[in-house]
């Protein structure tokens, strides 16, 4: 057995046994994907190993080995690559005040993924290819199609973050009425809508950031390509009524007197001229939001947010010295507009307060046309939790196939790719143990308990969340829960509240507000963009654009929990169990449980299912080729692997197997 750490071959004790546990899906915890790992073992404190671990025992050495980060590692058996992964240094054993041995553990690359992701969140990903200008052209394009320049990856779904939308074909006014009346005072306002990004692009960004590759027919599938995440980072609107978080840009003051540096666009401080205050005025349209920052020596001194024009805003400066400089910067809110800034500065010769001179400068108009930076709008969710939620929802298996490459497939597909191996000749068939599989008296599949108005009402009325599934069994076992870290939104097909109106409309929306009609944040919302809806003219709805014009609309995305806008074409849903779709108004049973979980759970609860334990002596060829999705044949009976404990030095193995049913 050979062990390599950060590319260097480590020394081993001659009598050291390294035992690996091989497991991916385990009946002891069916919601988790496991990775192969070793028992703890020791390495001698040899010259080679001391160099690898950089004399970790010596606290006086700087720049030493970082034990809280696992080191890249791989194991060879008789010069054949066995496993790639990471090695964790646990402790150094000392004897007579000298290092004797290093206690370590080895983990496969599946386990290492969580270390790689760390505490990073979705907004740490580079989604700049999906950034776009915040304007009517892009918003309207995204309502029923894709935003241009985003690689068909960004849409603007009909989900409201603040106002409770309804449809009243008689009433011409009323906050939230989206029926078209050629009146810009109500309807779907441009600032109501937030973008959504394809999950495939999030996966791509994860691969790029961490220099890994997911080899996955599942992630590349057409159905997965219809899944989007709503860019809902904070409760309320995306830009309107929100703190301005954009990075400010230097205001290029294009005219001014000699005290102002028109090349560097700043007020320099000299021995004879010390600024005491700055005042500024801004010309802007009434609806333009922006922030003015005053910087001293590249450090923000003060920030002020404004809407529309302002006059004579005073900023008193601290005592400055020669060599200091003052700059003005402007930050957009995201909703566009042009701002012209005029700046006036009083300069004093000394502390006596006698005015030496006054300096003025004026900008040309700076357009604050907002850009939607998609990463800034992503929900506050860890990358590891995002991947983990996908794994639990779709019962995915993540298996490393190379140092930075992972095979990601649903469990059933992964098992189907395994090889059947007859190992009867290597197994001690005279002695074995047989026991029942661990069973649970209740298995629950659930999303986050949403507080969005319709979802919470459904849960309170039915004692279970929309899309959740619960199964009870007559066993004296524990309860088991598979929980996904997303909100499963219950969408709404609007009904005309006018008694003589059109009745049930063709308009499908999401209401991301609470029962108290307050904005709601919750967990990230994912949904299918199942197709485009062309609505009858009698169901037309109103969009109020940035120019305060009411625009008649008949198109929108059908967003929801099913993968098609045509009932006969629905093959998948985001619900775990059978639910009535609020738009198509019929029940669909092709949910997550039936599609991705049912076969495994049904086999687990099959009356003939048993857990078998065998002892075996595996030759090198079998050890190296064995995969966790292989079927093992023993005396003409097939088994699937629950776990294998394998001594790499001796080839002795303890096989925990499930009979194939």
Could you describe each region identified by the protein language model?
Residues 1-259, 341-369, 374-391, 413-422, ...:
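Polar, S/T/G-rich
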Residues 83-91, 637-647:
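Short beta-strand-centered aromatic/proline hotspots
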Residues 614-618, 622-630, 635-637, 641:
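Extracellular low-complexity, Gly/Ser/Thr-rich intrinsically disordered linkers
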Residues 405-410:
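Minor-groove-contacting beta-hairpin "wing" of winged helix-turn-helix DNA-binding domains
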Residues 78-80, 299, 634-637:
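Glycine-centered tight beta-turn/hairpin loop motif at sheet-sheet or coil-to-beta transitions
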Residues 74, 327, 632-633:
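Hydrophobic beta-strand signal
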Residues 240-272, 277-365:
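Extracellular jelly-roll beta-sandwich "head" domains, especially the C-terminal globular C1q domain
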Residues 384, 392-401:
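Bacterial peptidoglycan biogenesis and beta-lactam-recognition machinery
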């Amino acid at each position: 057995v050979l062990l390599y750490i950060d590319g260097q071959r480590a020394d081993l004790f001659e009598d050291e046994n390294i035992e690996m546990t091989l497991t991916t899906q385990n009946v002891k915890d069916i919601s988790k994907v496991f990775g192969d790992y070793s028992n703890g073992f020791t390495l001698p404190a040899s010259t080679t190993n001391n160099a690898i671990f950089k004399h970790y025992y010596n606290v006086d050495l700087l720049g030493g080995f970082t034990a809280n980060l696992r080191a890249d590692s791989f194991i060879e058996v008789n010069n054949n690559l066995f496993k790639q992964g990471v090695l964790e240094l646990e402790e150094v054993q000392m004897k007579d005040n000298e290092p004797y041995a290093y206690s370590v553990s080895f983990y496969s690359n599946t386990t290492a993924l969580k270390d790689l992701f760390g505490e990073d969140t979705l907004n740490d990903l580079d989604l700049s290819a999906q950034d776009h200008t915040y304007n009517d052209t892009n918003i309207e394009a995204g309502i029923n199609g894709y935003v241009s320049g985003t690689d068909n990856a960004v849409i603007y779904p009909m989900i409201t973050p603040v106002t409770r939308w309804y449809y009243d074909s008689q009433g011409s006014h009323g906050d939230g009425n989206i029926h078209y009346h050629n009146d810009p005072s109500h309807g779907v306002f441009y600032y109501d809508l937030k973008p959504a990004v394809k999950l495939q692009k999030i996966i791509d960004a994860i691969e790029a950031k961490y220099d890994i590759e997911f080899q996955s027919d599942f992630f590349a599938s057409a159905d997965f390509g219809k899944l989007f995440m709503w860019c809902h980072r904070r409760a309320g609107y995306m830009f309107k009524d929100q703190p301005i978080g954009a990075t400010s840009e230097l205001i290029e003051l294009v005219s001014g007197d000699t005290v102002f540096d028109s090349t560097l666009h700043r007020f320099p401080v000299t021995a004879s001229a010390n600024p005491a205050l700055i005042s500024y005025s801004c010309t802007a349209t009434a609806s333009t939001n922006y922030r003015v920052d005053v910087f001293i020596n590249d450090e923000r001194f003060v920030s002020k947010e404004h809407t529309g024009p302002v006059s004579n805003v005073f900023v008193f400066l601290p005592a400055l010295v020669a060599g200091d400089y003052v700059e003005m910067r402007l930050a957009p809110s995201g909703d566009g507009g042009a701002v012209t800034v005029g700046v006036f500065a009083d300069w004093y010769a000394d502390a006596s307060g006698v005015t030496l001179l006054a300096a003025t400068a004026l900008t040309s108009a700076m357009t604050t046309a907002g850009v939607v930076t998609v990463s800034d709008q992503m929900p506050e969710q860890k990358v590891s939790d995002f991947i983990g939620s996908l794994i639990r929802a779709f019962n995915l298996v993540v298996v490393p196939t190379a140092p930075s490459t992972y095979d990601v497939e649903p469990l059933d597909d992964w098992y189907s790719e395994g090889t059947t191996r007859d190992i009867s000749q290597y197994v001690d068939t005279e002695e074995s143990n047989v026991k029942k599989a661990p069973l649970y008296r209740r298995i629950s599949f659930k999303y986050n308990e949403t507080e969005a108005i319709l979802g919470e009402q459904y849960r309170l009325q039915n004692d279970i969340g929309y899309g959740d599934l619960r199964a009870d069994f007559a066993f004296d076992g524990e309860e088991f829960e598979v929980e996904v870290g997303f909100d499963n939104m219950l969408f709404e097909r609007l009904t005309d509240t006018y008694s003589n109106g059109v009745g049930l409309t063709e308009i499908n929306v999401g209401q991301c507000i609470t029962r108290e009609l307050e904005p709601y944040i919750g967990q990230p919302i994912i949904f299918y963009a199942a197709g485009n809806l062309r609505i009858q003219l009698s169901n037309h709805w109103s969009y109020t654009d940035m120019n305060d014009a009411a625009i008649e609309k008949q198109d929108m995305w059908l967003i929801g929990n099913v993968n098609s806008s045509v009932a006969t074409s629905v093959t998948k849903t985001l619900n775990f169990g059978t639910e009535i779709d609020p738009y198509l108004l019929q029940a669909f049973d092709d949910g997550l449980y039936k599609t991705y979980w049912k076969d495994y759970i049904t086999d687990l609860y099959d009356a003939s299912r048993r857990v078998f334990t065998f002892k075996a002596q595996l030759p090198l060829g079998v050890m190296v080729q064995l995969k966790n999705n292989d079927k093992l044949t023993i005396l003409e009976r097939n088994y699937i692997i629950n776990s294998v404990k394998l001594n790499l030095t001796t080839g002795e193995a303890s096989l925990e197997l499930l009979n194939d049913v």
